[in-house]
């Protein structure tokens, strides 16, 4: 499995070279890589379907108990096949969609890196390896969503996705650390049997909240749903991949993986059922407010994510069967529909349903894939979407409590989904051409229509022959979640059942929604749905982000006020409060005792240092203050010399001399000291200085009285002369044991010196006149208008 994951990243590294050599044909070649990985995982299906699991471990960070471990069971196999199978189609599709884009190579690097991260996520066993891949998906999706980085909308959408999912990732890290500590293991495969002990632990509530925060943000559950529709600013291949089978299902996968550990409690069922059900119902109807194909598909994606979360919350055998079934259903039709939307935009110049119609003759292959996937989204038999909808209703009907409420909510959500599926699958192709397109309608290249066609055929094949997948892949995935195997039997026809009657009601009401969509989308009802679900959380996020920027600016202006004395005072005061307060709270301290002899020249030297400091503080002449500070510095150097540190004393003498020379050179450019500071300021500075001095003295006393582990010191003392051939241990440490660190510090200083030199050599510019300023402002205004246009 490690080779499978790494091969995707190797393909990402080679992608720019292949694009340069093969051009648009590179997509077909690169698509062979995820296809090969798909075949690798597919050949494990017979073994996994018989209840076995595969585990591979590689030593990575043994000192931190973090092996590079992978775990393949039915659940991870299902997602691995979706990631690689649909990923292969998307790679081919992107080659046609972005054929003329000058940064196609960069796009493939980002796309394949995301694919590798997502594949690593679903097969990872160690929680820290899982988290690394989890965060890598957020980072690479940020790059993909913001691929059109010259457009403000793309940058804003990418930033929104990164902040929301990144914030959830931080919460998830805390939850995983707590979970591993409570379970006593960092491997998911070993946690699966520890559900009772974890759920009975006092930390269960904290673990549950933190894990849900990570999963809800990743899978766009209310109130974190708003980033996903905004992410439609990215290229269509990104939407087709990230929002059908991969990134947005990462949170659902996490909840499914931890279902045996955290699931089954009232908290789990209530939280996932409530948030998932509300997300499902509201987003399904909110999709009907829009006329753009990608916007409709985005909100119906949120709807399905809510449905999957709700089914995981229910947690029964029927609900988990419905969850794994609908995961496949959604991946098949949503990936195809997004690619269809891209083909229509590519061929006509628009994705607006109000402008589309009559494309059946101009785009026959796109129509075939679009109609098949659209009808599957609507749940029309004999497509796989019909079976997915029926097993969802069966899950509600098998509930002992709240079953009727869940059934009604599911029917209402699917009514909107039927209308949306008919809108995106039929409306662009039937009827007459509604207006003049910006481009002459034409069929896309084979690389662009083969993906929707294959996914549409897949939905039809699984609908007609569900036995090809139910007893193998779906049953294994269900067992991976429930940790026990139950028979999964899917069929296109079960007779006249309550679920079938609910489907008939859904079709009838969905047809009404489709017929009267134009009036419905502007109705007061839809305005209310939009006010609650569409604008609220997103508006709160934008206002919070805007307010946070302004608040941080105000704080920065207050703290970073340009007064160096204030910076020093704040730094030392923080040190005094944090370190000193911590020592007092912990009962730390030092016993001061002295039994040695005090010599007269030591008293004289200490007196000299104190008098020089007093002179520096009290004088009104900068030159006198500099000389006084230098006298104090030379006095400290003499202290080093008297107490057996001649090299340190020599360094101190050199530093004091250079500092004195530099300060004397620049002092002529400084203003004089203007009178005395207010008594309050002087008292504050004096207290801070005295407090820091007392704190450092206390720390040194504690260090002296503490028994230290001398193994490192002894090692350095022994090796400095025999191997490094140096008599001075400090010098040997600087230039030998930590020579790379020293070289880095020297490099930093050299770069800083170069920067200062460049600044000093820059010619002074005259202050621009009013006319020049007006001209610059006008040119900036023109540029802004051009960018807006």
Feature map (PLM): residue ranges:
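Alpha-helical transmembrane segments and their helix-start/interface "positive-inside/aromatic belt" motifs
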Residues: 23-34, 157-166, 361-370, 442-457, ...
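Hydrophobic alpha-helical membrane-insertion segments
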Residues: 31-45, 168-177, 371-378, 451-468, ...
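Short aromatic-rich membrane-water interface segments that cap or initiate transmembrane helices
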Residues: 60-78, 194-208, 397-407, 488-495, ...
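Membrane-interface and transmembrane segments of multi-pass membrane proteins
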Residues: 439-578, 692-693, 708-720, 766-789
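Flexible extramembrane loops and terminal tails that flank transmembrane helices
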Residues: 584, 594-605, 614-617, 669-789
């Amino acid at each position: 499995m490690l080779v499978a994951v790494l091969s995707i990243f190797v393909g990402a590294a080679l992608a720019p070279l292949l694009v340069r050599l093969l051009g648009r044909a590179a997509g077909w070649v690169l698509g062979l890589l995820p296809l090969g990985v798909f075949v690798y995982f597919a050949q494990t299906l017979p073994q996994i379907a018989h209840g076995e699991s595969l585990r591979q471990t590689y030593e990575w960070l043994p000192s931190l108990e973090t092996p590079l471990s992978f775990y393949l069971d039915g659940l991870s196999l299902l997602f691995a096949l979706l990631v690689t199978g649909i990923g292969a189609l998307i790679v081919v599709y992107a080659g046609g969609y972005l054929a003329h884009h000058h940064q196609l190579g960069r796009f493939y690097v980002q796309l394949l890196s995301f694919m590798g991260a997502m594949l690593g996520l679903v097969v990872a066993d160690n929680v820290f390896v899982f988290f690394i891949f989890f965060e890598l998906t957020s980072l690479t999706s940020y790059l993909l969503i913001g691929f059109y980085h010259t457009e403000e909308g793309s940058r804003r959408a990418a930033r929104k996705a990164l902040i929301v999912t990144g914030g959830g990732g931080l919460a998830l890290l805390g939850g995983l650390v707590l979970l591993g500590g409570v379970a006593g293991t960092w491997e998911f495969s070993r946690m699966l049997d520890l559900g009772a002990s974890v759920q009975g632990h006092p930390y269960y509530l904290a673990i549950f909240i933190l894990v849900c925060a990570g999963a809800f943000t990743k899978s766009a559950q209310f109130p974190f749903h708003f980033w996903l529709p905004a992410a439609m600013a990215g290229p269509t291949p990104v939407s087709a991949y990230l929002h059908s089978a991969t990134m947005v299902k990462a949170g659902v996968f996490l909840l499914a993986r931890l279902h045996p550990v955290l699931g089954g409690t009232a908290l789990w069922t209530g939280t996932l059922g409530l948030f998932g059900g509300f997300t499902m119902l509201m987003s399904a109807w909110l999709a009907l407010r829009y006329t753009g194909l990608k916007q409709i598909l985005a909100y119906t994606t949120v709807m399905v994510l809510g449905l999957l979360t709700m089914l995981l919350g229910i947690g029964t055998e029927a609900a988990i069967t419905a969850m794994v079934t609908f995961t496949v259903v959604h991946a098949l039709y949503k990936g195809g529909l997004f690619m269809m939307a891209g083909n229509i935009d590519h061929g006509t110049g628009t994705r607006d349903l109000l402008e589309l119609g009559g494309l059946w003759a101009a785009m026959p292959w796109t129509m075939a894939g679009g109609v098949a996937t659209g009808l599957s989204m609507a749940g029309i038999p004999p497509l796989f979407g019909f079976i997915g909808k029926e097993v969802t209703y069966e899950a509600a009907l098998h509930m002992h409590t709240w079953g009727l409420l869940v059934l009604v909510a599911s029917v209402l959500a699917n009514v909107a989904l039927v209308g949306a599926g008919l809108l995106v699958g039929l409306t662009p192709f039937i009827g007459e051409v509604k207006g003049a397109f910006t481009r002459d309608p034409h069929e896309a290249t084979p690389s662009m229509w083969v993906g929707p066609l294959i996914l549409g055929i897949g939905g039809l094949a699984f609908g007609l022959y569900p036995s090809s997948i139910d007893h193998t892949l779906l049953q294994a995935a269900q067992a991976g979640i429930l940790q026990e195997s139950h028979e999964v039997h899917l069929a296109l026809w079960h007779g006249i059942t309550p679920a079938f009657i609910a489907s008939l009601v859904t079709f009838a009401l969905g047809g009404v929604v489709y017929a009267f969509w134009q009036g419905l989308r502007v109705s007061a009802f839809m305005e209310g749905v939009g006010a609650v679900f569409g604008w609220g959380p997103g508006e709160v996020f934008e206002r919070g982000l805007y307010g946070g920027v302004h608040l941080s600016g105000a704080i920065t202006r207050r703290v970073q006020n340009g007064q160096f004395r204030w910076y020093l005072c704040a730094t030392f005061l923080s040190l005094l409060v944090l370190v000193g307060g911590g020592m007092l709270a912990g009962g730390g301290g030092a016993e001061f005792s002295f039994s040695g002899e005090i010599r007269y020249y030591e008293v004289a030297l200490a007196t000299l240092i104190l008098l020089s400091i007093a002179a520096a503080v009290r004088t009104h002449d900068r030159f006198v203050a500099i000389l006084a500070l230098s006298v104090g510095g030379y006095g400290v150097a003499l202290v080093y010399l008297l107490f057996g540190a001649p090299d340190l004393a020599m360094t101190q003498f050199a530093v004091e001399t250079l500092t004195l020379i530099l300060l004397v050179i620049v002092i002529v450019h400084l203003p004089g000291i203007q009178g005395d500071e207010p008594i309050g300021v002087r008292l504050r500075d004096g207290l801070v200085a005295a407090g820091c001095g007392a704190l450092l003295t206390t720390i040194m006393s504690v260090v002296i009285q503490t028994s230290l582990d001398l193994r490192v010191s002894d090692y350095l003392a022994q090796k400095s002369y025999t191997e490094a051939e140096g008599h001075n241990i400090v010098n040997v440490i600087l230039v030998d044991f930590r020579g790379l660190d020293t070289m880095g510090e020297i490099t930093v200083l050299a770069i800083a010196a170069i920067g200062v030199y460049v600044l000093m050599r820059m010619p002074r510019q005259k202050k621009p006149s009013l006319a020049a300023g007006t001209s610059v402002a006008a040119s900036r205004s023109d540029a802004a208008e051009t960018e807006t246009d």
